[in-house]
Amino acid sequence: MNTPVGVAEIVLGPGEVVFQTRPTRLRTLLGSCVAITFWHPWRRIGGMCHFMLPGRIRRHQPLDGRYADEAMEILIRHALANGTLPEEYQVKLFGGGEMFPAHRHDPHMQNVADSNVHAALALAEQHRLKLMAQDLGSTGHRNIIFDLWNGNVWVRHQPMEAIEKDAKQKNQRIAGR
């Protein structure tokens, strides 16, 4: 990952949306949340959102990046404000990992991860966006790194099975001391 000199790095938390017009590295950590990356290949500008929920009932409230539909609207407004069209962007989707797989079939628990995945895919289709890649679903968390100077997105996926195995091994080492 060759990084140009003087590149800014921004870490997005849940509910944040960032759009940059200069070389920037965007990072986030996802569980059941989903990140959408927007990259304009000619202008080398773009952004990323980290949404938590598919949507809400909105009544005269400002846009809120915690919700998929509103985060997408924020990204689209940034694209238009920079003299570009949303369909010119390369879009990638990440996340929606089930964090509580043992409760997956519990009728009393809403599956937020699945709802977020469906919302992201539906929004990409609804806005006729150029979906270039996706890494959605499964279990566990993902570390995302998005380089705006070249459009590369790096993903490190840690499934729950691996997390549980690592924790078990660590506990065994501690118990053996």
UniProtKB/Swiss-Prot annotation:
The entry's keywords: Chemotaxis, Hydrolase
Keyword Hydrolase: yes
One example of a Gene Ontology biological process annotation: chemotaxis
The keyword Hydrolase appears for this protein: yes
Catalytic activity: L-glutaminyl-[protein] + H2O = L-glutamyl-[protein] + NH4(+)
GO molecular function, one term: protein-glutamine glutaminase activity
EC number per UniProt: 3.5.1.44
HAMAP family (UniProt xref): CheD
Biological function: Probably deamidates glutamine residues to glutamate on methyl-accepting chemotaxis receptors (MCPs), playing an important role in chemotaxis.
Family the UniProt entry places it in: Belongs to the CheD family.
Designated name of the protein: Probable chemoreceptor glutamine deamidase CheD
Gene behind the chain: cheD
